[in-house]
From Swiss-Prot:
One of its GO terms (biological process) is cellular response to cadmium ion. Its cofactor is Mg(2+). This is Adenylosuccinate synthetase. Its main location: cytoplasm. InterPro entries: Adenylosuccin_syn_GTP-bd, Adenylosuccin_syn_Lys_AS, Adenylosuccinate_synth_dom1, Adenylosuccinate_synth_dom2, Adenylosuccinate_synth_dom3, Adenylosuccinate_synthetase, P-loop_NTPase. It catalyses: IMP + L-aspartate + GTP = N(6)-(1,2-dicarboxyethyl)-AMP + GDP + phosphate + 2 H(+). One of its GO terms (cellular component) is cytoplasm. Coiled coil: none annotated. The lineage of its organism: Eukaryota, Fungi, Dikarya, Ascomycota, Pezizomycotina. One of its GO terms (molecular function) is AMP binding. Plays an important role in the de novo pathway and in the salvage pathway of purine nucleotide biosynthesis. Catalyzes the first committed step in the biosynthesis of AMP from IMP. It comes from the Eukaryota. Belongs to the adenylosuccinate synthetase family. Binds 1 Mg(2+) ion per subunit.
C-alpha cells in the first residue's frame, strides 16, 4: 500500500478538496481519518459544485472506494443528506462506494444542543465552534460513554446508551430542547439503512493492503489540532499526521507522501489568536476577493498575511514532503504582499519557528514582516509555472526557502478543478 496523506497546514479552509479530488482520480481508496460534519470543503467539477462535510471527496471519482474512519464522529442524518445531495447532482452509485468504520462514534442532535449550551456558558471567551456537537461527542468518547456506529445495529444496547447520555446531560443542564424518544424512533429507520455501510475497519483495510494508491483526506488543519493547535481554540480531534496514522492503523513505512495544503495568505474562522490578522483594508480585500465564508457555517473568515512562523511550526509537526499552495490568484491585485517571518514575544524574545502554547501570549506577539512586490496581473486559470508573473514565482520560491526547501508542487490559480499548476 502506497499512502498519500493530505493535511491542512493552517486553521482549515485551505482548499484541501481540490488536491484530494485530483489525487483521488488515481486512488483505489480514499479515507477520512478525523472530524465530523463540522468540516467543509467544495469541489467544482465541470458545471457542478459539490459541498463535502463528512463524506470523503474521493466519491467524485467513480473508481474510488471511500471510508469514514475510526477517528471520526458521524451525524447520521447529515451522512444520508449529504449522500443524497451528491447522488442528486449526478454521482450515481456513490452509495455503493462509501463505508463507515464500526468504531467511529455517533454524533447526535443531543450533542449539538449541548454544544450551544456550553458555548453560551463561556460568554466572551467562547471557542467559536460550528455548533455541530463535535466537541461534546468527542468528550463522550474520551469519557468512555460514547456510542459507536457499530452499536447502532444492537437496538437494546443503543437505546440503553443513548438514554444514559440523555439522562446525564439533563442532570447537568436541566431541561433540554431535545426529545430522546423522537431520536430513538428516527434511529429505528436509520438502523435498517445503515447496515450495508458499516464495516470492521481493520478487515476492510486489509483487503486494500496491496492497493497501489491509498489517499487519506485530512479534515480541519494542524492549528486546530487538540494537542498542537491554539488550544483551547481548537477542534476536538487530532487533525495532524499522528491522528491519521492512529485513526486508520497506518503502517508509517507505507506513507509515500505527506502533502501540506497552505493558502497563499491566512484565514481563520471563529475565536482565538491570529497573529497575522489584518483588521484593515488589506484584510477586507482578502476576504472579499477570496470569498472567505465558511462552507459549514457561512461565517465570515478572518483574514491576514501568510504566516511563515505558523507554517514552519506546522511543518515540524506534520513533516510535509510537498506543499499545495492555494488561492494564489486572490493576491493578483495587491501592490505589495507581506509575509510574517518572526514573532516578537511580550518579553522581547524573537522566534521564527515556534508557537507559544499560551493563547494569551500568542495574542500579544508582534509580527515581523517582510514586504514583497505584488505582480498586478491576472493569474486565474494559469496552468504552467513559467507562465506566472515573475513576482508571483518569486513569492512562491520565497515561501519554499522559508520552509526549509519543502517544494511547492501544486499551485491553485482559481476555483475550477483544472485551475492548478503541477510542478514536476
Amino acid at each position: 500500500m502506497g499512502v498519500t496523506i493530505v493535511l491542512g497546514s493552517q486553521w482549515g479552509d485551505e482548499g484541501k478538496g481540490k488536491i484530494t479530488d485530483m489525487l483521488a482520480q488515481q486512488a483505489t481508496l480514499c479515507c477520512r481519518a478525523a472530524g465530523g460534519h463540522n468540516a467543509g470543503h467544495t469541489i467544482v467539477h465541470g458545471d457542478k459544485t459539490y459541498d463535502f462535510h463528512i463524506l470523503p471527496s474521493g466519491l467524485v471519482s467513480p473508481s474510488c472506494v471511500n471510508l469514514i474512519g475510526a477517528g471520526t464522529v458521524v451525524h447520521v442524518p447529515s451522512f444520508f443528506k449529504e449522500l443524497a445531495s451528491l447522488e442528486d447532482k449526478g454521482l450515481e452509485g456513490a452509495g455503493k462506494r462509501i463505508f463507515i468504520s464500526d468504531r467511529a462514534h455517533v454524533c447526535f442532535d443531543l450533542h449539538s444542543v449541548v454544544d450551544g449550551l456550553e458555548e453560551a456558558k463561556l460568554g466572551g471567551r467562547k471557542v467559536g465552534t460550528t455548533g455541530k456537537g463535535i466537541g461534546p461527542c468527542y468528550s463522550d468518547k474520551a469519557a468512555r460513554r460514547g456510542v459507536r456506529v457499530g452499536e447502532i445495529l444492537d437496538e437494546a444496547l443503543f437505546e440503553r446508551k443513548l438514554r444514559s447520555l440523555d439522562a446525564g446531560y439533563r442532570a447537568r443542564f436541566g431541561e433540554l430542547e431535545y426529545n430522546v424518544e423522537e431520536e430513538l424512533a428516527r434511529f429505528k429507520e436509520y438502523r435498517k439503512r445503515l447496515g450495508p455501510y458499516i464495516v470492521d475497519q481493520l478487515a476492510f483495510l486489509q483487503k486494500y493492503k496491496d492497493a497501489p494508491n491509498t489517499l487519506v483526506e485530512g479534515a480541519n488543519a494542524l492549528m486546530l489540532d487538540l494537542d498542537h493547535g491554539t488550544y483551547p481554540f481548537v477542534t476536538s480531534s487530532s487533525t495532524g499526521l499522528g491522528g491519521a496514522v492512529q485513526a486508520l492503523s497506518l503502517n508509517p513505512t507505507s506513507i509515500s507522501s505527506i502533502i501540506g495544503v497552505v493558502k497563499a495568505y491566512t484565514t481563520r474562522v471563529g475565536s482565538g489568536p491570529f497573529p497575522s490578522e489584518q483588521l484593515n483594508d488589506a484584510g477586507d480585500k482578502l476576504q472579499g476577493v477570496g470569498k472567505e465564508f465558511g462552507v459549514t457555517t457561512g461565517r465570515r473568515r478572518r483574514c491576514g498575511w501568510f504566516d511563515m512562523v505558523l507554517c514552519r511550526y506546522s511543518q515540524a509537526i506534520n513533516h510535509y514532503t510537498a506543499l499545495n499552495l492555494t488561492k494564489l490568484d486572490v493576491l493578483d491585485d495587491f501592490d505589495e504582499i507581506k509575509v510574517g517571518v518572526a514573532y516578537i514575544l511580550p518579553d522581547g524574545t524573537r522566534t521564527e519557528n515556534t508557537m507559544p502554547a499560551d493563547p494569551e501570549v500568542l495574542e500579544k506577539v508582534q509580527v515581523e514582516y517582510v514586504t514583497l512586490p505584488g505582480w498586478k496581473s491576472n493569474t486565474m486559470g494559469v496552468k504552467k509555472y513559467e507562465d506566472l508573473p515573475a513576482n508571483a514565482r518569486a513569492y512562491i520560491e520565497y515561501i519554499e526557502r522559508g520552509l526549509g526547501g519543502v517544494p511547492v508542487k501544486w499551485i491553485g490559480t482559481g476555483p475550477a478543478r483544472d485551475h492548478m499548476i503541477c510542478r514536476e
